[in-house]
Amino acid sequence: MDVNGHPKFQPSPETDGPLPLTSSTLMVSKSLQQDSLSMVGDRLPPKTGAVVIDMGTGTCKVGFAGQSQPTYTVATILGCQPKKQATKDQSELETFIGEAARSRPELRLVKPIRNGIVVDWEAAELIWRHILEHDLQVATHEHPLLFSDPPFSPATNREKLVEVAFESLHSPALYVASQSVLSVYAHGRVNGLVVDTGHGVSYTVPVVQGYNLPHAIQRLDLAGNHLTAFLAEMLLGSGFSLQQEDLDLVENIKHHYCYLAPDFQKEQARPDEECKQSLKLPDGRTVTLGKELFQCPELLFHPPEIPGLSPIGLPAMAEQSLLKVPQELRPHVARNVILCGGSSLFTGLEGRFRAELLHSLSPEDHVVVMAHPNRNLSVWIGGSILASLHAFQSCWVLREQYEERGPQVVYRKCY
């Protein structure tokens, strides 16, 4: 069912004819287009009580539905220590998240997400609780929660998410939405090919009328944190002294100075001296880097030969995903190729990706690549739009429904 509660068209390879546009599809599409445009401008849809949570490998983004951007974006890192004085009604642990946790060397840091998937539910819950209660300062039992979920997440993770939301956070209502679908909604569309490269994982997913096409998903377990590790290795190899706490400096270099070369072979052939840059770091030190600055993000286009790692990069992944979309549906997807995720923000990436994808496909495919300036927030913005739509309000999984049917209710209401 779509967000209006009507049956949705479910694409299959056997479908003949053009993509059907039902009245409900048109209504949803129009609502999404109107609201997504207003999110970018000065006008906003009415703020609802719902809270949107998009927790990725690198950052957790949280804010109220109807806002144009999350209220809090913090590193997905948790550190805990015993409270010196805790009452009987209080937790015995004092939690620190994000930079507050990093700044305390005495804490053991936990990263609850690996390659986009929650692997430590206790730590994930503590991060959510900390942001909701201490930062947003809301009573969790009063606010519906919309969570994003990777398109390749195990189904059991959704069940666990429902349990945490209702049993631990005591939310009155919940919805779990696919990250790729939310990214499409953020652009006012219901169809598109999402090319997402974030901190822990990269993937391409075709979306048709708000549904992922699972058979066409391409995944690459290489993203921002792997690029940071590569750059750190290059710095160490050049004699630059690095400690574990200096990884933030490496991240800073990566974000501000790394770029995708329009032509890698041509850039690689330039004399080393022409490529060198002297970089002033926030801590006052100076480092000289050269070809590492474009060799680092090049890994997204040409992954290293590592056992178990997909050998194809983002443009080839996008091509393979598109070619797996049924022919009659492909035009609706190809004209909305959406770049998103923090690692898509490298200078030169949009142009290089577009050029390689267009070169590999036929002009008849009419490929259009979209890259919004805030594409690192696409998933959260899509959730903010969806949860604030009037037509969506009947789609929440309510506490009463959970108590009646258990965590499996998520499969009936969240697609």
Curated annotation (Swiss-Prot):
Keywords recorded for this protein, A-Z: Cytoplasm, Cytoplasmic vesicle, Cytoskeleton, Fertilization
Compartments in which it is found: Cytoplasmic vesicle, Secretory vesicle, Acrosome; Cytoplasm, Cytoskeleton, Perinuclear theca
One GO CC term on file: sperm head
UniProt xrefs under Gene3D superfamilies: 3.30.420.40, Actin, Chain A, domain 4
GO biological process assignments: acrosome assembly; fertilization; single fertilization
Region (Disordered): 1-22
Chief subcellular location: cytoplasm
Role, per record: Testis-specic protein that plays an important role in fusion of proacrosomal vesicles and perinuclear theca formation.
Similarity comment: family membership: Belongs to the actin family.
Complex formation: Interacts with ACTL7A.
Name of the molecule in the record: Actin-like protein 9
